[in-house]
Amino acid sequence: MSELLFEIVTEEIPAVYIQPALESLAAGAAKKLEALELSFGAVRTYGTPRRLTLIVDELQSRQADRRQEHVGPSKKAGYDDGGNLTKAAIGFARSKGCDPSLLQVVETPKGEYLMVVEDVKGQETAALLPALLESLIRELVFPKSMKWADYSITFARPIQWLAALYDGAVLPVQVEGVECGRTSRGHRFLAPAQFELTGASTYLDDLRARFVIADPMERREMVVKEVQRAVREVSGVAGAAPILHEGLLDTVTNLVEYPYGVCGRFDEKFLQLPEETLVTSMREHQKYFPVAGSDGTLLPLFVAVNNTKIDDLSLAASGHQRVLRARLEDGLFFYNDDRKRPLADRCPELQGIVFQNKLGTMLAKSERMIKLAGFLAQTIAPDLKEDVKRVATLAKADLLTAMVGEFPSLQGIMGRVYALHDAEKPEIAQAIEEHYLPVRAGGEIPRSLLGALVGIADRLDTLVGCFAIGEKPTGNKDA
């Protein structure tokens, strides 16, 4: 049994492309090897922003010889009245490289037919792999691909070089002028020199020694440790800990080849912002990890993960602090400006937002929601009818705020925050946020009946409206 190592090195690939590409690479390789009737062991993939790697263990070194049966024309068409082979039978035999005298007659469900048995010699795996690997590259699909130079291939980013080793020997693979070799490079800044790959068994160690953590799971663990280390070394606050959001961890893992955490600070004045705003600004825009105290409240700290070791931590931190400060200044301005007008005063302006071309504006939708939610409340909980109608009236008003314009993921959340500022009842403010729940299948659901009733009204309006105009909703996302 043999091993295969295939490395595709590119310019930096967007983080969200990497894991799907690795899954596609593994599935494609397994499918193609099975089609070639080659047995194999584990199929492993590794990826960083600059490389996608396939390793196949225990790969069969040669196809087995096999006998292949080919069924041709019927017996009636294969012999004339004198019992001699017809041109059709002779042509069939020759097309299979067989002497016509070796044709056999076999019984099939459709009757008697001519058949030839072909002895097929198995090919060496090394001879089959070049075409297989080239097809893998050409068939990889990304959310967005690009072309470069005058090549016909499309890929997530331009391919810089390829390495393909089968049992330590270089495979003659060529894709658009890029030839496979046995050389690779380490980290772009920390170990840019070329080095020779020896094989799959040493691949991860070879890269690790050159400041590239190719295994995403190992790199993810390193990100966690680096973020925790950075907080420990800089915070000066007992019990301080980073908020390790799973989605952000996945993203940051695929943004770096060698993670290094840097802890920075921001002005405490920004803590007056709603926690969700601070966290969203750090997480979505800057890919920073927020830091909380032992009581769970946010601290004026954050952690950035760099893609290289840092000699001057204070200089690196100040750069991140400067960028974040600009974001938070904008957020604070939006927050203060938004609160100058009550949500209720914004509702008429929903006329300026199109919900769906054939279904009208968000104001029209809001008015339908008020009627639907009121009907549901009258049927299920009459004592909540007026509160339900109030929630439905205000539910979409925060779409007109600058904060939601900057951070769309905060819709509903900012509605709750601003409703409380406007002295709306707490249960109404809570329901404004909850009416969007669940965001996805299996997600959190409304805890209050108010939120549930308005949420149902919102979805009913969308579903019925879509069916009415002939736009059948799909199951890709909750309506």
Segments (PLM) and residue ranges:
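Amphipathic alpha-helical "coupling" segments that flank catalytic cores
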Residues: M1-A479
